[in-house]
Amino acid sequence: ASQRTLKKEIIAEVMRLFDEALIIRAVSGSEAMQAKIEDLMDDIMVFTDDSLRRVTHPSGKHNPQLVKAYYRDLRHYIITNLTSFSERLDDFVEGL
């Protein structure tokens, strides 16, 4: 997969999570929950910036094996964090 495709996949998943967070924030009644959701949204934005930056700057640029391992680890990092954000959003939904 190309860097461009990976970036698009990251952005699509992050937008889905961010949209869900906006909806949850809109229907939540308490200001405390809204503040927690805004913190989660901040975490999502930091994750997005970090991930997009990491996509374009692989380590071991001239060694194909290192690049392949770098992107394998990066994909694992992305999937792990997206799953974590999704679980945190699910916890907010259960709290409504």
Label for each model-derived stretch:
Residues T5-K7, G29-S30, K36, D49, ...:
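Serine/threonine-rich low-complexity intrinsically disordered regions
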Residues A1-S2, Q65:
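N-terminal leader/targeting helix
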Residues D39-D42, D50-L96:
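Low-complexity intrinsically disordered segments
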Residues S2-S28:
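Short terminal alpha-helical segments
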Residues S2, K36, Y70:
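Conserved acidic
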Residues I24-Q34, L96:
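Inter-helical turn/loop segments and adjacent helix faces that build the functional surface
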Residues K8-R16, A35-R54:
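Amphipathic, heptad-repeat alpha-helices with coiled-coil/zipper character that mediate oligomerization
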